[in-house]
Design a protein with these regions (language model features):
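N-terminal, intrinsically disordered, polar/charged segments of Gram-positive cell-envelope systems
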Residues: 28-97
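Generic structural signal of hydrophobic/aromatic residues within well-ordered alpha-helices
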Residues: 38, 42-43, 97, 101, ...
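Feature for intrinsically disordered/low-complexity regulatory segments and propeptides
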Residues: 99-111
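Generic N-terminal leader/processing signal
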Residues: 1, 5, 25-27, 83-85, ...
Length: 434
């Protein structure tokens, strides 16, 4: 009896399937098409002909999207509206959107094709909740403690677009009146405190001694160092000593002191400024800066090794270099204890750089120049007749070369010749008491 009943039930089910298939449109031939039609029938049974409605909860607020009919301005638009069921009820739209997703289209594209006003709704919400990130900021105070003040960065926030369309799709597949909570994602800042911290490494430090200089020359060295102090260079930015320090004039604060003109020491405004430029030049070399312009004096200065001086003259000779470190560079130039000091801060150097001065050839030192102190400028009145005093040492002419040695993990990996120079001889000066 049970077997007979089972056979009757199976036969009836088979007949029902055949009859259902016979009444389907002719174009539905595949299993996928059959599934799509089943979705459409299910949607019609559940949703009827309601319009889609979406309520979004975010930041303690709610806003609602209600599907609206769109008027067609021309035949082409009318065709698009019809094909995408833009003005249809929810049941047809939900089924069509699901078909698109099943065929590999993204949920956003599948929804927007039938709901063209949905993106502007999403953008409106996004603008209301979006908060831009705040980068970490760094202030350089060269003479302060600490030298660098770094603020913390803050993440921004924005609506998660992908999650929005995914949630809308899932909600509208369940019901024409959907409620979702808007998901958000963080926007990272472009610059973090850690990024700024990496740019505070002491890249190089160099100093020269000016303690035995005269009062006016000391003033000029110190003034020039003050004028270059606090310089900041972005990656790729160039520095000009003359542009930064300005004209060597009384109006610009400079005094008269010894300068080199035509191979002789004479009085002139700004004497000593070349010691400031030389100090800065050497620190720039050690910091890995790309030196664009630097030249030697006619006479070898006593405060630095040959081929490592940087003579400057406003309007003609300059010290120029470019920051090519991959980050910002901060320059601190100052004077302390009779020394001119230049420090470069920025990202850590790839190499430890060492200077090397080589004297290629050297001539004979010229005979000293003798001055009789007829006016009593150098000796006290009670000084013994015939007393001698040296007021300037002499030096021979020389040819020199400057090299930079690059060390990595304690090993010299390359050597680079940067310049070759010729220096004139310097006559020593002796003063005699008549």
């Amino acid at each position: 009896m049970k077997n007979a009943f089972g056979k009757i039930f199976a036969t009836a089910a088979a007949i029902a399937i055949v009859l259902f298939a016979a009444f389907l449109p002719a174009e539905i031939k595949t299993a996928r098409a059959f599934s799509d039609k089943a979705d459409e029938i299910a949607s019609e049974r559940i949703f009827g002909d309601q319009k889609s409605c979406l309520t979004v909860c975010y930041s303690g607020r709610t806003t609602t999207y209600t599907d609206e009919e769109i008027a067609a301005p021309d035949h082409e638009a009318e065709y698009e509206i019809h094909e995408n069921k833009i003005n249809s009820g929810h049941r047809e739209k939900a089924a069509l959107v699901k078909q698109r997703v099943n065929r590999g289209l993204s949920k956003k594209c599948a929804l927007v094709a039938s709901y063209p006003l949905l993106p502007s709704f999403f953008e409106k919400i996004s603008r209301e909740i979006e908060r831009l990130p705040k980068d970490s900021e760094m202030t350089f105070s060269p003479g302060g403690q600490p030298k660098f003040i770094i603020t913390r960065e803050k993440n921004g926030i924005k609506a998660d677009e992908r999650a929005f369309y995914s949630d809308v799709f899932a909600a509208w597949q369940r019901s024409p009146t959907a409620v979702i909570t808007l998901k958000t994602e963080q926007i990272p800042p472009a610059v973090t405190a850690a990024d700024n911290k990496k740019q505070t490494f002491l890249k190089a430090r160099f100093c020269t001694d000016y303690s035995r200089s005269g009062k006016n020359r000391k003033h000029n060295v110190e003034l020039a160092m003050q004028k270059t102090d606090g310089t900041e260079l972005s990656d790729g930015e160039s520095f000009s000593f003359n542009k930064t320090v300005g004209r060597r004039s009384g109006e610009n604060g400079f005094y008269e002191a010894k300068i080199i003109v035509g191979g002789e020491y004479v009085d002139g405004l700004g004497g000593g400024v070349c010691q400031a430029s030389t100090t800065l030049y050497n620190a720039a070399l050690l910091a890995g800066m790309n030196v664009d312009e630097a030249g030697s004096h006619t006479l070898a200065p006593s405060y630095v090794a040959p081929s490592f001086d940087a003579a400057v003259s406003y309007g003609s000779r300059d010290l120029k270099f470019t920051n090519c470190s991959g980050g910002r560079v901060f320059i601190h130039t100052y004077c302390s204890g009779g020394k001119a000091i230049a420090e470069f801060y920025g990202v850590e150097n790839k190499y430890h750089i060492v200077r090397k001065s080589v004297v290629v050839s050297q001539g004979e030192a010229p005979e000293d120049k003798l001055i009789i102190d007829e006016e009593g400028k150098y000796f006290a009145p009670d000084a013994e007749e015939g007393s001698m005093m040296r007021i300037r040492g002499g030096s021979a002419s020389l040819v020199s070369e400057g090299y930079l040695l690059y060390y990595e993990s304690g090993k010299c990996v390359k050597t680079r010749k940067i310049r070759s120079d010729k220096y004139m001889p310097v006559r020593g000066i002796l003063v005699k008491k008549p």
